[in-house]
């Protein structure tokens, strides 16, 4: 029996509101990497054909499995809080993955669609968009649990030297085992941004929770350092000043633009509501004139 099977993902469709949350999260800090999980659904289509061939008393069964078309649709993301902030590494704890699975189940009940954790994303500040060897091995570990699991990378704070113009690059990948080797290598997956006219409730909540998550990370780091017994008073005062400076920077870089964006969207929604109410009145007048 000969079986041919395609196990990888052929394409990823990322909705624009989820893309916006990922981008805002990646741009929230340029000193450390950030991370999150992607919630969505998998469309897996395929068919199998079986044919029986007889040759005398012998029977040969040939089963052919058509290549399955696996498409990942990402509808929302969950921003994860970092327990250890490092410049070139991010880690997702089993507790965070379990909590994300519970959130996906809750969304599945609300939407009536088979929502699940379909991937993860993280940022690459000031470095290339391509995954590192650690990223490729981490992705391979996730694919051992789910073959359709994908990884997204957002490379930000990249400046074109001649023009001084900043760029943001993004990519989607999976890990495949290299031929004649035990190592893994990246397989780039085509990613498409799906436009949306409105921002979903889940993505809006994630965007609003971002400042609080960043503040919790700073508080945990400060408490961990402040709890050391061998620090003198001057060092503690300095650490407190650094903590205050980081919070003020977050308010300026994250909270302020987020508040302005929400106010702008509220104004747009109010204008749209007035337009719809006026259109309703015009239609009602036209309907009454026909009677």
UniProtKB/Swiss-Prot annotation:
CDD domains: MPN_BRCC36 (cd08068). Keywords: Coiled coil, Hydrolase, Metal-binding, Metalloprotease, Protease, Ubl conjugation pathway, Zinc. A motif (JAMM motif) lies at residues 122-135. It is an enzyme of class 3 (hydrolase). Zn(2+) binds at residues 122, 124, 135. Residues 12-179 form the MPN domain. It holds the Pfam family BRCC36_C. Belongs to the peptidase M67A family. BRCC36 subfamily. Metalloprotease that specifically cleaves 'Lys-63'-linked polyubiquitin chains. This is Lys-63-specific deubiquitinase BRCC36-like. The lineage of its organism: Eukaryota, Metazoa, Chordata, Craniata, Vertebrata. The gene is Brcc3dc.
């Amino acid at each position: 029996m000969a079986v041919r099977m395609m196990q990888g993902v052929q394409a990823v469709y990322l909705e624009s509101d989820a893309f916006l949350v990922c981008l805002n999260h990646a741009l929230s800090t340029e000193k450390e990497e950030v991370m999150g999980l992607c919630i969505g659904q998998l469309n897996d289509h395929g068919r199998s054909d079986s044919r029986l061939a007889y040759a005398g008393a012998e029977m040969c069964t040939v089963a052919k499995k058509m290549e399955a078309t696996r498409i990942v649709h990402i509808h929302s993301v969950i921003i994860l809080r970092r327990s250890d902030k490092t410049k070139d590494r991010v880690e997702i704890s089993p507790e965070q993955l379990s909590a994300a699975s519970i959130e996906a189940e809750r969304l599945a009940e609300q939407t009536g669609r088979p929502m699940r954790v379909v991937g993860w994303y993280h940022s690459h500040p000031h470095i290339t968009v391509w995954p590192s060897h650690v990223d490729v091995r981490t992705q391979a570990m996730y694919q051992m649990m789910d073959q359709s699991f994908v990884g997204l990378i957002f490379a930000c704070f990249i400046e074109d030297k001649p023009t001084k113009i900043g760029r943001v690059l993004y990519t989607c990948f999976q890990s495949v085992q290299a031929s004649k080797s035990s190592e893994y290598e990246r397989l780039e997956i085509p990613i498409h941004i799906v436009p949306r006219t409105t921002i979903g409730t889940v993505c809006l909540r994630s965007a609003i929770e971002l400042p609080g998550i960043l503040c919790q990370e700073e508080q945990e780091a400060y408490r961990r350092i402040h709890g050391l017994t061998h620090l003198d008073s001057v060092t503690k005062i300095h650490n407190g000043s650094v903590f205050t400076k980081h919070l003020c920077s977050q308010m300026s870089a994250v909270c302020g633009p987020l508040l302005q964006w929400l106010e702008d969207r509220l104004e747009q929604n109010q204008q749209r509501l007035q337009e719809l109410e006026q259109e309703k009145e015009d239609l009602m007048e036209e309907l009454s004139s026909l009677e």
